[in-house]
Swiss-Prot record:
It comes from Schizosaccharomyces pombe (strain 972 / ATCC 24843) (Fission yeast). Its EC number is 2.7.7.19. This is Poly(A) RNA polymerase cid13. GO terms for cellular component: cytoplasm; cytosol; nucleus. It is found in: Cytoplasm; Nucleus. Residues 275-330 form the PAP-associated domain. Residues 547-565 have a biased composition (Low complexity).
Amino acid sequence: MDNANCVGGCKFETRSFQYRRRIPYSLGADPLPPVHPLSLKNLVDIDTDLISSQLYELYDSIILNDSGLERRYAFVQKLEQILKKEFPYKNIKTSLFGSTQSLLASNASDIDLCIITDPPQCAPTTCEVSAAFARNGLKKVVCISTAKVPIVKVWDSELQLSCDCNINKTISTLNTRLMRSYVLCDPRVRPLIVMIKYWAKRRCLNDAAEGGTLTSYTISCMVINFLQKRDPPILPSLQMLPHLQDSSTMTDGLDVSFFDDPDLVHGFGDKNEESLGILFVEFFRFFGYLFDYEHFVLSIRHGTFLSKRAKGWQFQLNNFLCVEEPFHTSRNLANTADEITMKGIQLEFRRVFRLLAYNCNVDDACSQFTFPSLTDTSFMDDYVNELQLEIVPGFSHGRDSSDTSCTESPPEPSHFAWAFDPYNATASPYYNQNINSSIDYSSIYSNDVPAIPPNVPYTFVDPYTYACYINNNSYLPPSYMDFYTWYNSPYPKSSHHFDERHGGDRHEKNLSNSRRYSRNKFHKKKQSSGPFQYYPDAFSFTPTDNNSPPSNSSSSEVVSPVSLHSEPVLSTVQAFKS
């Protein structure tokens, strides 16, 4: 019998919770405005040593101790004995997975257990397992057979422990092995993941089922990818390292092989000397302000970011944050959170960064979020107003008014050459290098530049997208208007803005798409009519020829940050003329 086909006749089949949305709809889904990295407080001005000491002290108090581990093993043994007694002919074994096995459990963590039968076809249903547990004196037995992964929840009043049991979902044990291998690669990984999971639990942001947010496993994958992208990297991609791959490494048609000897890669991240406090602060800076949620997918399998367009995820439901499942690569782990929820979580990231940057207080950053009573409607309104204060990075709240180390405006551009590389989450986004002060760069940084009148036919290079292109030859802007866009446009990366400017003429947009395909040599050259002529070299920029204009460009020039491979400079770039 299928595990999930027991709805209706099972008295344990009930909702174990009342769904309470964590991020209210009133926050809205309007995208957050971009924030200049130089407007954020510099890392050298933050007392990361104090933050590290607080983190380690809190980590030692919450991490699962030996006595807690013994209680968990005793509970698992008790459950296995019950199952073998109730189902003597099922050849049942149990396997721990989740945070307990991956060394990421705290004293308050639940137990995750996989019930394995041989053969799998003779497995009992979740309702049968629920009834067996109830007959043997276990409390609070709940059967959730309609979930994506059917589970049985059970509570032991003697050991004061709860457990979630699934049946024959062995892929979960492989995910745990992979996570454990990453944890053992570097001594900073375990405390960093544990503390970020602790923050998420305190802020009620790790409950995908009840609050519509993220799972703890998704958050752990975000941390792993963040550490893989440090400069220099702290973690490798264990699935990309050479390892044994044969028929035994295939499960449900998926390649689940990886390099599983962490001792051989221990010391991989020794060149990176960042402390726990630095990594904790930079995690929230990166996902609060710097990560491009619109275009990229987090992939620990590849140890980098992937393009949403390349994976075909740009039109998926709930795809604001995309985290690739390391084995089942067609699955987005973060699709449990919709766009409004992810906007709220991103603002929560910003809140933590502000509190750490100006107060250096981990307890304040991890303060407990408590849901209000159902009759208290003003609480969530106040919470939304508090989140909206994080949209503008002025940080006027929660810091000393005499602190002038960070302002809403970036530093004087004549002293810095700014170039932001979204492929590398570097600790400091600016370079101490004098540049040519004879050129007026104020139009790049100033918020007071008047909008260009609609009748002026010039477009300007979007610095963020151009930096992506220059830094990676394989990167292709998702659309024509992502690469060349109106400066100060309210829709800087929107294809709808392109349609509005040209009267909704889809034919012209299709012509620009054909130029994108021609650059990859997927289509033969063909002639097209319209205001834009078809040229195979329309996007002929290369990292070694940054100033070469496209073949159909005008002579108009604008200043844009370019060439992140070499010494960063600000140089002129040819712009298209519409």
